[in-house]
């Protein structure tokens, strides 16, 4: 059976994936430390089972940085500044974005959810999101 190539968005300060999987002890303390409920433990099979993930489309990470100090194994390392969290890059799908599809529409959902708004995500022309 061939394994699917699946990637998960890990909490801030996560080691590279292979090292993360070897280091994480599946304790859930990172998820318990998250005041927003953004960090949750994966319910899957394989080595990723009971490791932390973030699903920004459901509950975004607000980069409060409470999860790294809660990690007893070192799978999550402290992050000095939000910009160093390096949790990925947002992508704007212009064919699905109301501000791009309908002129004059003022949807701010992605901008409001971005913890680095104004830096990681900006509003071009005052209302069109850009990364």
Predicted regions and their residues:
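Non-ligating segments of multi-cofactor redox enzymes
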Residues: 1-131
């Amino acid at each position: 059976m061939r394994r699917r190539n699946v990637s998960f968005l890990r909490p801030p300060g996560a080691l590279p994936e292979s090292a993360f999987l070897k280091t994480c002890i599946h304790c859930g303390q990172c998820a318990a430390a998250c005041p927003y409920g953004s960090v949750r433990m994966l319910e899957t099979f394989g080595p990723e089972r009971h490791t932390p993930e973030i699903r920004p489309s459901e509950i975004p990470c607000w980069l409060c940085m409470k999860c790294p100090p809660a990690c007893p194994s070192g799978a999550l390392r402290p992050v000095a500044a939000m910009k160093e969290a390096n949790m990925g890059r947002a992508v704007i799908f212009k064919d699905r974005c109301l501000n791009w599809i309908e002129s004059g529409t003022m949807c701010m959902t992605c901008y409001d959810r971005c913890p680095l708004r104004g830096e990681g995500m900006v509003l071009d022309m005052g209302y069109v999101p850009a990364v």
